[in-house]
């Protein structure tokens, strides 16, 4: 069967950016920036994106493009006879399934809140009533399961229509709409009374605040966010590399994806901080920011129903773009592993992913258990821990070693592939850092994640 190709360079960049852009850009980055010294945190974050995220992304793209295979078979196409690098391909697929086991549920939350806000069901509620609306959603397996199934059915339907006619076409529209909505929301926030104070807190470097949090904590936080924001390590980027031609060098393409991801993260802060300072609300992170703090603000804002609806539509698009990208990876891997066509792989995964996502849905209600407290309190937190603390850092380390070690694909092969085409090039003077320095940083992120979870 002939390998499918993306129709355009824009499609490749928007698909890859859609995979990287997710809810963490909104519910984690602005909070970390605010607490970590504003502009000081942002500067360190940008530095770590360049020295940490960019090289590994280019390696995933290179492995995909050189092999023209999904992550499960890419290593086999490139490794030397008798080597075992391909084992990671199976772990990458498991990591993608694990990620979707909870991400489909969270995407469902965004869809539910878009409906609730657009229908006016959150308008005029008190702060306590807004908080209880979120609690009631978590306590209802029916509501959570319904929206999770909507997300899975929509995403599988898009992927089943094919690479160009389904995934690329829908993602282009979704990503352009996402970016447009963000700009509209940010402009609205900039005209709020507390905008100047909020932007000062967010963007002006404040090293005194950075010292209060701890310089080391801030640096590690910036490093972790720069690493995890790009969804590296489970082959979700490699699959899109396998769908493109050799016209453009891959480091330059990686820069474009990272710039889009960073634009969304920084613009999210432009939306959130002016609103929080205008309405005197403490800026929080995670689900409490998205489902309690911001709905409270929208409930008290002029035209709050409109702005709230736009915000949750943006969040739904951000979540769905990631779901679509990872579903494509899963479907393509299963097509190659099981020798299925796209439609059969899509149908099988429709039922499989719904079944695998149910524990996350039920973990907040029928299957709630105190034993999950060490991970954060629910099945979702355990699944998130496995993906974020194990599969992403260790998977990134495997890609890194495979591309730089003489026992893997090797530096010369990687450099030849990544530099093929027009654009920014990888040079030999980078070899020492990428071969010896970067693996140490990734190992540190892995070790610190375990320490922070179990020992801190």
Task: Please describe what each predicted stretch is.
Residues 88-91, 338-350, 382-442:
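C-terminal membrane-solvent junction of multi-pass transporters and transport-like membrane proteins
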Residues 5-16, 41-44, 83-97, 145-151, ...:
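Select transmembrane alpha-helical segments in multipass membrane proteins
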Residues 5, 11-13, 19, 145-146, ...:
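Loop-to-transmembrane helix boundary motifs in multi-pass membrane proteins
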Residues 1-27, 56-61, 65-87, 245-249, ...:
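Membrane-interface "cap" regions at the ends of multi-pass membrane proteins
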Residues 11-48, 235-236, 241, 251-255, ...:
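Transmembrane helix-boundary motif of multi-pass solute transporters/channels
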Residues 3-4, 32-36, 66-91, 104-164, ...:
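Inter-helical loop and helix-membrane interface segments of multi-pass membrane transporters/permeases
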Residues 32-36, 84-100, 135-137, 150-174, ...:
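Membrane-water interface regions at transmembrane-helix termini and the short interhelical loops
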Residues 2-6, 168, 172-320, 324, ...:
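Membrane-embedded translocation segments of transport machinery
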